[in-house]
UniProtKB/Swiss-Prot annotation:
InterPro entries documented for this protein: Ala_racemase, Ala_racemase/Decarboxylase_C, Ala_racemase_C, Ala_racemase_N, Ala_racemase_pyridoxalP-BS, PLP-binding_barrel
Reaction(s) this enzyme catalyzes, per UniProt: L-alanine = D-alanine
Known EC number: 5.1.1.1
Residues recorded as bearing N6-(pyridoxal phosphate)lysine in the entry: K40
MF terms (GO), sorted A to Z: alanine racemase activity; pyridoxal phosphate binding
Organism, as annotated: Streptococcus pyogenes serotype M5 (strain Manfredo)
Name of this chain's protein: Alanine racemase
Named cofactor requirement(s): pyridoxal 5'-phosphate
BP term (GO), one: peptidoglycan biosynthetic process
UniProt entry tagged with the keyword Isomerase: yes
Cited Gene3D superfamilies: Alanine racemase, Lyase, Ornithine Decarboxylase, Chain A, domain 1
Keyword set includes Isomerase: yes
Xref: Pfam families: Ala_racemase_C, Ala_racemase_N
Amino acid sequence: MISSFHRPTVARVNLQAIKENVASVQKHIPLGVKTYAVVKADAYGHGAVQVSKALLPQVDGYCVSNLDEALQLRQAGIDKEILILGVLLPNELELAVANAITVTIASLDWIALARLEKKECQGLKVHVKVDSGMGRIGLRSSKEVNLLIDSLKELGADVEGIFTHFATADEADDTKFNQQLQFFKKLIAGLEDKPRLVHASNSATSIWHSDTIFNAVRLGIVSYGLNPSGSDLSLPFPLQEALSLESSLVHVKMISAGDTVGYGATYTAKKSEYVGTVPIGYADGWTRNMQGFSVLVDGQFCEIIGRVSMDQLTIRLSKAYPLGTKVTLIGSNQQKNISTTDIANYRNTINYEVLCLLSDRIPRIY
């Protein structure tokens, strides 16, 4: 989707806030721990290349979801370690090796397929994934991991790391977290040749369970200034939300009692009122279930009335504001604020999803 620079809807990304957020977490974790910046999904909608470059002096490497995301960083001149967190099939190894990209291997089936396809792993850098209870990808026993490491070395790979991922590190009940932690520790203790890097700490683990950190952390949502738990747990230190979303009024009119607004005529005016149109819609990631939520105009909360359309939404105004008046969808407007977590709570989802759904039709301004 093409970025629409010729309309007033923009996302403003504060790179300095991201740098300060990462620094805040780094002060909170043990000295000597390696930091990976998680920049998958275009850095959670903030812009992977720009964020990665901004963090270059502060981090040891980057985590992405897939090979294309890794190649994007390499092509942008990022020369630090890049770890692909998802599974890369053996038929795509050549590009990873050629670009010095570290891959995740999560099963013995992967080795079997590599051998079947006669793939050599000479020069390949690997982290092994352990499924300690997340239930997605990974090996489940020391025996399997030992066999995988031996097999990878036979094929010429350099096994540099081993890691897992916690399912409930952002929840108050730490029962499942502790079960996973003990599982992972026991598995690590059973390794015949433990890789030098051991990591299990995502954002939530890094800030609420810093005493459990091994020798690397993966900082994602916390880097962008958001609470990994939403509103459930208090942050141990302040963070700065790095992304704001704003637009402008492009049409203002008065409607009368009985007039309807939007698809399905789901809103009917009970009295005469001013309605403003804002050029953002569900194609931008501002989903249809945001009807009834409020945005900020002139320091006032203005309700979204009628259904959110693909490209536009409509809001109730207190007066006839001039065209071009600023509309804040995420961020501050005259001492009032709308956070990404506020939106997530309204949608009954998580703040991660709100950010990741903001489409590339919205230009990012740095």
